[in-house]
Regions:
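Active-site diphosphate/adenylate-binding microenvironment
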Residues: 5-18, 23-26, 31-38, 327-407, ...
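Short acidic loop-to-helix transition motifs that present clustered carboxylates
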Residues: 28, 49-54, 77, 367-369, ...
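Generic enzyme active-site microenvironment
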Residues: 233, 272, 361, 413-414
Length: 554
């Protein structure tokens, strides 16, 4: 007879969940002890719950199978919520296991007692369950795995009371078989094909998200584009996008709503493929939240719970585009930069050094604005982005990606302020010997908030307001921080030194951190002028507006 913890682990392993990212406490000790009896399960320790949840997200994005977490009570879940929020927005499959007090102990309202289910529903709206008995635990776990897998993928939270975990009487359960997701109806496919055929080149755009940004689906979208002149756009922050030489180029919508509106202007029909209709990230005084241009109709080819690949394939057939050759990105690579570093030069150096089949975890914020353009033609790679906007994702997601794909180099482009949210991820990289190169942009400010302060029209910033966006006093030393967490690190100030550091880090196994001290991307007069330039875009002729957009966010 198995304990509940043993039955839970066996259900996870048999259900294809082979990695759990943990930050356990007393309530989870029986699960921890049971790990030795499940050698197929890899347990990866994190020093902070936000690292564990972000790593499970990165793992799920790259493995394509659920990652699991082990968290301690409601407070532990609370510490991990930000990156579970990102996972929810990215539709990542995660089995989120949260330990709880023994069922008979909750009545005493001990110090760590809390309403875990209420906290969990913020990030697991589709599946939250407290397992009420050891006999039922295996089945609860199997249903959590099925829920996490989707489609679409989701965070499924399973709450594990301590006595349910330690008691005898558990048995493993089989994950229910998933029905194949439906593809778009024939009526939908034919209607959209008719709209595409009836328009002029550029009138119609496919807005791709989720699974539509993988190689197979991109090739199909590329055929549609070649055959009909349809534009290919991607959501602002994709969970995972495959890009680079030999793949169809896709234009990501800009973060700033004014720039995204320029990209969308002129489109008559916007077709969603595993994506949502575009909206601004925040509300701004006097500005619309809905970014769909006037006169544009929004259609859905495939929703997140539908067969994206099959739906695109059906559209290709309906257009007679099966033999159309998609436009592919030509191979190109920038030259390594020289001289004093800027954020643009750091992006250039990374692109110049990018190895084949790399994975990029991008949380560079304003410092990484030029990375997409300078890396467009480098060898094919994956980019993982900040799906839910909750910063502190970049380093943990890099951990998970490296665990999922140990044979692929991982590069984390990380802003200084964001890094400090989950810096403990460096320790896990060192402990696990993960092949992650962290390129740290230290501009000593919350650069994006300086821009937002101007855009929101909040008025002239005084010394107190400015101090809230300044990270220069005291100066953070990321080399010493990394060394203290077991990661080799160096600071560079020139393009030549950065190129040398990248070559060394990418050639030597294990984690490395390279700190680049760079000026903020948008400062001074450029920062003052930016809101006026952004507001003027809607009134400018489209070619002029697009040229300005290309300068601000290439």
């Amino acid at each position: 007879m198995s304990t509940g913890a043993q039955a839970l682990l066996r259900t996870l392993v048999d259900g294809g969940v082979r990695t759990v990212f943990t930050n356990p406490g007393t309530s989870e000790m029986h699960f921890v002890q049971a790990l030795d009896g499940a050698p197929e399960m890899r347990a990866v320790l994190a020093l902070f719950e936000g690292v564990a949840t972000g790593a499970a997200d990165g793992y799920a994005r790259m493995a394509g199978t659920p990652g699991a977490t082990l968290l301690h009570l409601g407070s532990g879940l609370g510490n991990g919520v930000a990156n579970l929020h990102n996972a929810r927005k990215g539709k990542s499959p995660i089995v989120n296991i949260v330990g709880d007090h023994a069922t008979y102990h909750t009545q005493y309202d001990a110090q760590l007692q809390s309403d875990i289910e209420t906290v969990a529903r913020n990030v697991s709206p589709g599946f939250v369950r407290t397992s009420a008995s050891t006999a039922q635990l295996g089945q609860d776990a199997a249903e959590a795995i099925a829920a996490a897998q989707g489609p679409p993928g989701q965070v499924a939270t399973l709450i594990l009371p301590a006595d349910v975990s330690w008691s005898e009487g558990g048995s493993a359960a089989k994950v229910p078989e998933r029905a194949a997701p439906p593809r778009a109806s024939e009526e939908t496919v034919q209607r959209l094909a008719g709209l595409i055929r009836g328009g002029k080149p550029g009138d119609t755009a496919l807005l791709l998200g989720g699974r539509a940004l993988r190689r197979d689906t991109l090739m199909l979208a590329g055929r549609v584009s070649t055959a009909a002149g349809t534009r290919l756009l991607a959501e602002v922050f994709p969970a995972r996008i495959e890009r680079g030489a030999g793949l169809p180029p896709v234009e990501r919508l800009a973060y700033l709503a004014e720039l995204a509106s320029v990209q969308l202007r002129g489109i008559k029909h916007l077709i969603l493929v595993d994506s949502k209709s575009p909206v601004s990230f925040f509300a701004y005084p006097g500005k619309a939240s809905d970014l769909v241009p006037d006169g544009c109709e929004v259609h859905t080819l495939a929703a997140p719970d539908e067969d994206v690949l099959g739906s695109l394939d059906a559209l290709v057939e309906a257009l007679g585009a099966a033999n159309a050759q998609p436009l592919l990105q030509e191979a190109s690579r920038p030259k390594p930069p020289t001289g004093p570093l800027t954020a643009e030069k750091v992006c250039q150096a990374v692109a110049a050094a990018m190895p084949e089949n790399a994975i990029v975890s991008d949380e560079a914020q304003t410092s990484g604005l030029t990375f997409a353009s300078v890396s467009a033609g480098v060898p094919a790679h994956d980019v993982l982005t900040l799906t839910g906007g909750a910063i502190g994702q970049g380093l943990p997601v890099a951990v998970g990606a490296a665990v999922a794909c140990p044979d692929r180099p991982v590069i984390a482009l990380e802003a200084d302020g964001s890094a400090m949210y989950t810096l403990q991820a460096l320790w896990t990289m060192a402990r696990e010997g993960l092949d992650v190169t962290v390129v740290l942009f230290n501009n000593r400010s919350y650069g994006i908030l300086n821009i937002e302060l101007q855009r929101t029209g909040a008025g002239e910033a005084g010394p107190v307001a400015k101090s809230q966006l300044d990270l220069s006093t005291p100066q953070m030393d990321f080399v010493q921080l990394a060394l203290g967490l077991g990661v080799p690190a160096r600071r560079v100030a020139t393009g030549e030194d950065l190129t040398d550091a990248l070559e060394h880090a990418l050639a030597e196994p294990g984690p490395h951190l390279i700190e680049t001290v760079v000026p903020s991307t948008v400062t001074g007069a450029r920062l003052k002028v930016m809101p006026y330039a952004l507001n003027a875009l809607a009134k400018l002729p489209l070619p002029v507006a697009r040229a300005i957009k290309g300068k601000l966010a290439p």
